[in-house]
Amino acid sequence: MLLIEVASCDDRADFALIARAYHFAKKYHEGQTRKSGHPFLHHCVEVARLLAQLRMDHTTVAAGLLHDVIEDTPATYGDVAAAFGDKIADLIDGVTKIDQLPYESREARQAETYRKMLLSMVKDIRVMLIKLVDRLHNMRTLEHMRAESRARTAHETLEVYAPLAHRFGLARIRWELEDSSLKFLEPEIYDELRNKVAMKRRERETYIEEFKAPIEEKLHENGIEAEFTGRAKNFYSIYNKMKARNKPFEEVYDLLAVRIITGSVRECYHILGLVHGIYAPIPERIKDYISTPKSNMYQSLHTSVIGPTGQYVEVQIRTAEMHRLAQFGYVAEMAAFFGLPIRERCEVVACPEDAALEEAAPLRMGPPQLQPAVPERERELGKCWE
């Protein structure tokens, strides 16, 4: 299934390389199990699958399969380099924790591990991406760890990995890391928020339909095509609002976010004017991240308006290209340039907005759409595992 998923993202990928990495990992992780009781290899495959969903190149997917062999098996850097070359060996070494050398404390060892990871990241940004998805899958299985380990890992995730994901524009990864950290650090609050958000789901969907109806009418009158999505904000975001305002869940009103995706920058501004003509805006909440992108190159128009019944609603307006990059990250986009050093990638990102999008255009990587492979393709991919 991993090869079929990679094929759905890049049919030019080196499937033989990925298959060799799979068999190498299988050999060295033989007999190892995780705290969950699952074979260790399952974690390696999941990390590789997540990297494939980020549209990463076959070298990175292979490194995802191998990311723990130096740290957790007898395999050495030399073994990996001999089998797969220095580039993959360097990626794996970059995400390998420093456990072999003596340190006065766990904190000192962890600090040195961070330092090593950051230095490796300067050479190749894919080190950070592998580490992020490794942490993401570890958080999905964290309940099998001891209570002390759960708390320590959740704190580290919230303080280090979620901000990294945010910094590099990986919104989906950031939200899941934040919410899963809250789940283990404040389980009662997490369960309460999850239950209350779930209870209000039908009410929320009805409200969003009522909210967007007059906007859709205006868009139709002006000949603008757009797609609407609506969601509640993630649990950690809601939790922070409750803390900052010292209010219970029921008194935090701006929990709804509506996203409008359209075809051009010009239409984004046109839609903003139409929305403000229908609903009263809150002036201090209007943000133009299109003309002035965030430091991670995120682009969108943000506004908060007073919707029906007086409830605050956040509205985000962006183009389809901006939305794709907001969801999957500019770093994932740039890292898709096979072997391109981080400094060169940063030069691409630092171009003026239009030029940056033109540079990224050939690497279109929308949300994963895993399609059944045709029989011939399945047979071809299947041979790689033999």
What is the predicted function of each stretch?
Residues 1-313, 318-384:
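Active-site helical microenvironments for divalent-metal-assisted chemistry
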